[in-house]
Regions:
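Ribonuclease/tRNase effector modules and their secretory precursors
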Residues: 1-97
């Protein structure tokens, strides 16, 4: 039996992850995309961190940013991905065009 490719595994979100997404301004579609095509890094306790920079071009927390980095921390199970938490980072601070 072969291990499923990332594109075919379902992605589930813990309550904690959904709360952090709301607090940190991450959209579910961007988190899913980060897991599918983002840069993969080993994290603590057997978890995996994915990173994906997405075009943002709007305000967050009173400042305007061009790029948002979405970084979900994931438990990769045999048949699914479980999003444990989500970090976000903002870049290219500037002014609205």
């Amino acid at each position: 039996m072969t291990e499923q490719e990332p594109a075919s595994k379902p992605i589930v979100f813990t309550t904690h992850a959904r709360q952090r997404m709301r607090e940190r301004g991450a959209r579910e579609d961007d988190v899913r995309e980060a897991i599918r095509i983002g840069q993969r890094e080993t994290a603590h306790r057997g978890l995996v961190l994915y990173r994906l920079n997405v075009e943002f071009n709007r305000e967050w927390d009173g400042r305007y940013y061009g790029v948002q980095q979405v970084a979900p921390v994931v438990a990769e199970e045999k048949d699914r991905f479980v999003v444990v938490t989500v970090y976000t980072f903002y870049f290219q601070e500037g002014e609205k065009a």
